[in-house]
Regions:
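Helical "substrate-binding/catalytic lid" subdomain
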Residues: 81-199
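Rossmann-fold dinucleotide-binding core
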Residues: 2-4, 10-90, 94
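Conserved small/polar residues in nucleotide/adenosyl-binding loops
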Residues: 201-205
Length: 205
């Protein structure tokens, strides 16, 4: 069977491994886990970052497809490794929602014009794509859904499960998971992750 399934979704690594093994055993098909990062805008531009796991020869065969939809893809090894790296990506990205919300709340408390922060810090160590993208939306309370809070919580729950499997402490992710749980329990709306700042503002001043 020459069938190749290229999975760009984010799933638990152990589930990916089990499914890929069963699929190959029953049908002979190959499974490549290739979760992506970059968001809707990068997807439209074909500039996603892709983390790849699976048989190296099969990955080489689908390389033209990966190159077409990404600015960069990186092969990490056996099936499931792409999903593990995606969780590393999520640890960095999703905790930044809470960190940037805290920074915005701190700026507000001291009457600092937070809209100037991304440009002010762009050439320092704090400068990042996340600061440029998320911080203005947090400051201006632009909560139009781009990264749903419910999806963020789901991914943080996945991080927790994988960390527990290896007895790896993830205190930052655990706290961020608690914050998003509180946020989602407080509203029935489809909230963007940037609305996490609503838990931190002490007033509307």
């Amino acid at each position: 069977n020459n069938t190749i399934i290229l999975d760009l979704s984010t799933t638990l690594a152990d589930e990916t491994i089990n499914f890929a093994n069963q699929l190959n055993k029953k049908t002979g098909a190959s499974w490549i886990d290739a979760p992506v990062s970059g968001g809707p805008d990068k997807a439209l531009e074909g500039n996603l970052a892709i983390m790849v796991g699976g048989d190296e020869e099969v990955v080489e065969y689908v390389k033209p497809i990966l190159e077409e939809i990404s600015s960069k893809f990186t092969y990490f090894g056996e099936t499931g490794s792409g999903q593990i790296v995606k969780m590393i990506n999520q640890i960095i990205v999703l905790n930044n929602y809470a960190i940037l919300a805290e920074a915005a709340s701190f700026a507000q408390a001291w009457n600092i014009d937070a809209n100037k922060i991304p440009e002010a810090l762009c050439d320092g160590h704090a400068g990042s794509n996340l600061l440029n993208d998320l911080f203005p939306r947090i400051v201006n309370r632009d909560f139009a859904p781009k990264g749903y809070a419910s999806q963020i919580l789901k991914d943080l729950q996945m991080v927790s499960k994988l960390a527990n499997a290896k007895n790896t402490p993830t205190p930052m992710s655990s706290l961020t998971k608690q914050l998003f749980t509180i946020l989602l329990n407080s509203s029935q709306e489809k909230l963007d992750g940037t609305s996490i700042v609503c838990l931190l503002y002490t007033s509307d001043a």
